[in-house]
């Protein structure tokens, strides 16, 4: 690493944000499989896009088709998966975008690692706090059924732990709130902190 140096860009992060007339941030959706991470993140992405904001959504399954296709689901691979994703999120935010990421990200230390990449107030942890029973009853990919049958090992919530965020910026329970209600809560949070404009 001693022969590698950091090159500053001529166009700054602040200038890129000003050009887009918005403030960059990362909304980090975390929770069990089936808790609504991708659903709510996608709905928020649409809502922000319709308001004219420049956004990008990174989804756990999609990232494993390319950037992280060489990784499995061991604890070490999960850590590396989140490390890579965190660095990519930072690059998107440096480009002035509002970034959303939807990853189980079960370990507190990994989420803390990503938080440290961002200036204060720009990392927004969104804990999808749906009960395991709700997530398992949805089971959109049939993964819980396979995990219960022993066909999938290291499945979060079944035989691998999920460390619940102690102080997330936002907590949403999709067993109690609709998609629209969740999006409204997220929009309100962003407006209150002047990350987006109030209507």
From Swiss-Prot:
Q: Which reaction does it catalyse?
A: adenosine 5'-phosphosulfate + ATP = 3'-phosphoadenylyl sulfate + ADP + H(+)
Q: Which family does it belong to?
A: Belongs to the APS kinase family.
Q: Which organism is it from?
A: Marinobacter nauticus (strain ATCC 700491 / DSM 11845 / VT8)
The entry's keywords: ATP-binding, Kinase, Nucleotide-binding, Phosphoprotein, Transferase
Active site, renumbered? 105
NCBIfam families per the UniProt record, alphabetical: apsK, PRK03846.1
Q: In which pathway does it act?
A: Sulfur metabolism; hydrogen sulfide biosynthesis; sulfite from sulfate: step 2/3
Q: Which Gene3D superfamilies match?
A: P-loop containing nucleotide triphosphate hydrolases (3.40.50.300)
What is the name attached to this protein's record? Adenylyl-sulfate kinase
Source taxon at top rank: Bacteria
This enzyme's EC code(s): 2.7.1.25
Question: What high-level taxonomic lineage is stated for the organism?
Answer: Bacteria, Pseudomonadati, Pseudomonadota, Gammaproteobacteria, Pseudomonadales
């Amino acid at each position: 690493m001693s022969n590698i140096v950091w090159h500053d860009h001529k166009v700054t992060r602040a200038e890129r944000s000003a050009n887009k007339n918005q403030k960059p941030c990362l909304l980090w959706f975390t929770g069990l499989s089936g808790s609504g991470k991708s659903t709510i993140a996608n709905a928020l992405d649409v809502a922000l896009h319709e308001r004219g904001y420049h956004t990008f959504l990174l989804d756990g399954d999609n990232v494993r088709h390319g950037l992280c296709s060489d990784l499995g689901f061991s604890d070490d691979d999960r850590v590396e998966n989140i490390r890579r994703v965190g660095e990519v999120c930072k690059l998107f935010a440096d480009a002035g975008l509002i970034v959303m990421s939807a990853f189980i990200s079960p370990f507190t230390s990994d989420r803390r690692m990503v938080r440290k990449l961002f200036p204060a107030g720009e990392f927004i942890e969104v804990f999808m706090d749906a009960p395991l029973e709700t997530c398992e009853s949805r089971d959109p990919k049939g993964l819980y059924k396979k995990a219960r049958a022993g066909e999938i090992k290291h499945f979060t919530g079944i035989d691998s732990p999920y460390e619940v965020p102690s102080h997330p910026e936002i907590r949403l329970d999709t067993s109690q709130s609709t998609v629209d209600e969740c999006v409204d809560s997220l929009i309100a949070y962003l407006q209150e902190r002047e990350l987006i404009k109030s209507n």
